[in-house]
Amino acid sequence: MNLSIGTQPARGQFDGLAKIARYNWPQYVGGFVTIWVVTAWLWTSQAVHPQLRLAAWIGVFFVAWWCIASLVASHWIYDRSELYRWTWIPTFLPAPPNRWLNLHAGLDESSKVLLQLFPNSSGRTGDFYDAKEMSEPSIRRAREEQGESDAEPIDFRSFPFADETFDTVFLLFAAHEIRCVASREIFFQELHRVLARSGKILLVEHARDLANFAAFGPGFFHFMPAREWRRLADLTGLQIMKEQRMTPFVKVMLMEKKI
C-alpha cells in the first residue's frame, strides 16, 4: 500500500471504498439481492394489499439508500477526505511524541506513517485482537487480507508495558472493536497506566449519531456514541483536551492524562 504523506492520498483513488466493500461483502450482496427479489415480486404480483405494497417499496428504498450511501460515505471518508493524508496528526497534537504506542485490532494502516511523521521518536505497535471478544466476520476478513504483521500481540486487559512508558497512544479506528463495556473500561485503565504524566491519547472513531445512521443504517450500532468515550475518559482519569470532526462521520478526540 502506498503510505505517502502530504497532498497525495495514502490510498489509491478507490482503495478505501474497495476495502469496505470486501470486508462487508455479505451485507451488500444480501442487500442488493433483497432489492431485486422484492422489486420483482412487487412488479409481478397483482394481489398485494396496497398498504403492504407501500411498506415493501419503502423497505426497498431504505435498503437501496443504505447500500449506496454507505459506499459513498466510505469513499468520502477513506479516499477523499484529509483523514488518510496524515498531515493533520502533527497539527492536532500539542507537541511531537517521543515514545508512542499505536494500537489496533489487526488492521494497521498507520504505524509506518507515524514513523515517517515523527522520525526522531521511538514507536511501538500493538495488536490487541481477541477472537472471543471480537467475533464479527468483517474484522476477521480484514485481518486475513492484512496478512502477517510486525505488531506485537498484546492482551488489552493487561499491557506488557511498564507504568508511564509512553507519552502518546494512537487509537485510530480501533477502540470500538472492544464490544463489551467492562472490557473497554479495563482497556482504558491500562491506557491510563502506561501513559506518562500528561500523556496524550489520540482517538479516531465513527460516532453512533444521526449522520452515521443516515449513511450506514443499522450498521451505525457498530460504532460507539461519543459520550461513551467521554465516560471512559472521565472514569479512568483522562480529560478531553480537544474534539474535532473530520467529515460529518468521524470524530477525533485528544485525551490527556490528569496529573
Task: List the predicted regions and their residue ranges.
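Core SAM-dependent methyltransferase catalytic element
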Residues: 236-259
